[in-house]
Amino acid sequence: MDRRENDRRYRSRAEMLRDRRRRRKRTCLIELLIVLFFIIVVVAVAGIFVWKKYGPSKVKADLNEYYGVDAAEQAAVIVNNTILEQKGIVSDGQFYLPYEAVRQEIDGGFYWNAAEGTLRYALPLDLVEVPAESKEYTNAGQRESKDYVIVKNIGDQTYIAVDFILEFGNVTAKTYKSPNRVVLFDDWGKVKTTTAKKDTQMRWLAGVKSDVLAEVKKGDRVYFIEEEGDWKKVRTEDGIIGYIKSSALKSVKTETITSSSKAPEYTSMTKDYKINLAWHQVTNEIANETLSETIASTQGLTTISPTWFTVADTEGNLNSIASSAYVDTAHAANLEVWALVRDFDGGIDSPEETYQLLSSSLARKTLIDNLMMQVQQYNIDGINVDFEKVSEECGEHFIEFIRELSIECRRNQKVLSVDNYVPMGFNSHYELEEQGKVADYVIIMGYDEHYAGSWESGSVASIDYVENGIRQATKDVSAEKVINAVPFYTRLWEEVPKTEQELAAQAGTEQAQYKMNVTSEALGMQEAEACVAQAGAAVTWDEETQQNYAQWESDGATYKIWLEDSSSIEAKLKLMEKYQLGGVAAWKLGFEKPEIWSVIEKYIK
């Protein structure tokens, strides 16, 4: 009995121990599961945090905000790879672009005259004219019409219908909704493109957290703009510009894109030889009789430009001292005559008058008609325009005058050349690029680096100044149309120290930077050399300006002169050769030494 009881008690204790062990195991397992659960929760929370912080955003960008379109009638304007700040409009189902954007970014040939309320476009042989708020227009005097209003005025802004623009420019355009936008392309030739390897997303900025601009499908072509780290900036066909991961795109390749549109062809009267032009300053009819003796010592001269025409008034009337005998003499010497017309010295003579003249369509027409009458009457070969009073606000009126004059010159087979200052920021309103499209020659007056009103002495035409003018001009105009003009003159400078009183009076002004009072006079080549010889001054070659230089003291003044001679002119002619220009011009006949002509002739053959 006792043994059985002991066995029972023993088994009971053993079972209790087993139960305890099982309970402890269950407790440990539960505790382990709880720990594992908390670990999983922590990892999940951390993962979510990391994903939110570093994972790609799925937020769709607001395209209205992206394009800056904040009104239902507004339309974004995309030109090639640029979204313009200016906005177009949609009216009666037609897309319209702001005039300034059209002129600056798409086609500078459009000309809007706000005072007259007309839009013009000069074709090679005819003029298109459109009144505002009209479906009708004239082309070569013939009335035509569209089924939409061509030009709209809203507030102080003028808009042109996209469909009308496409009739003239070498540009394509596609329009889209949601949001309204116009995508224009005129960057013909070689462009860089790439293709999506897989479905991917375009983002606003180069980063996965940036908002999504567009879904890009596998095989979609995009236009490559630039690389930014692991991203590529690209443009879609429908004008969205953003970033795609480089790994989602194939290698960039170069394609050639050609235009299917037909832009107007402005034929040119450029010659098959280098131009060697000299301006002949003629101030009265009697001076015309000096031509034979004036050109007697020249060599290789191809063209002469007498200063015959001045604009008499702001209505477009002309003062003329043209001569048939002069033209006959020039033609007998195998010279073409390109008669010069100017807006100074002898008629109108201020920026205000030039503006009044050129901003009037009637005055421009009157002036052009008067010029062509003279050309026909005297058998003149071409017109040389020398307008030096064109203000910035007059710039677009000036270039429209050149375009309209080019129509008549083209119709009558007469050469049109335009004189220009050395291109700089402050005279960019002369619009060399537009001149180069319609004029036969664009002449750069490569002198007056230092002029009569300069506050310091200096060269009239140092080599760097001349080359900069040529370099800038040939960026905008075909080299064969560019003529560089050289000076047959120089300036003798006189410097006298400013007094203390003068310096005090000029304190705080730009003029105060210059410690000398300077005056100068223009001298021809022979006169300049005689002046140096009379002073007994030594002449040294100045490598920086590529000119011979002399300096001397006399009666408390310092005299300085940078000579123009065979050496300096040849240095400038080498630039003509280097840039393969259309020729050389010179101001003015009678200022040169005879041996200059053999130097010039060497470079124009």
Language model segments and positions:
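SH3/SH3-like beta-barrel fold
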Residues: Y121, G219, W231-T236, I244
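Hydrophobic faces of well-ordered beta-strands that scaffold small-molecule active sites
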Residues: N276-H280, T302-P306, V337-V341, I383-V385, ...
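Catalytic domains of carbohydrate-active enzymes, especially glycoside hydrolases
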Residues: A287-A312, N370-I383, K572-G583
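Substrate-binding surface in catalytic domains of secreted glycosidases
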Residues: T314-I321, D369, E392-A530
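Glycan-binding loop/region signatures in secreted carbohydrate-active enzymes
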Residues: S259-S261, G346-G347, E353, T490-K572, ...
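Boundary/entry segment of secreted carbohydrate-active catalytic domains
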Residues: D199-Q201, I240, K245-T294
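Primary recognition of N-terminal secretory signal peptides and signal-anchoring hydrophobic helices
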Residues: R13-E228, T258-T270
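Active-site-adjacent "subsite" loops/lids of carbohydrate-active enzymes
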Residues: D345-M373, Q377, I444-S454
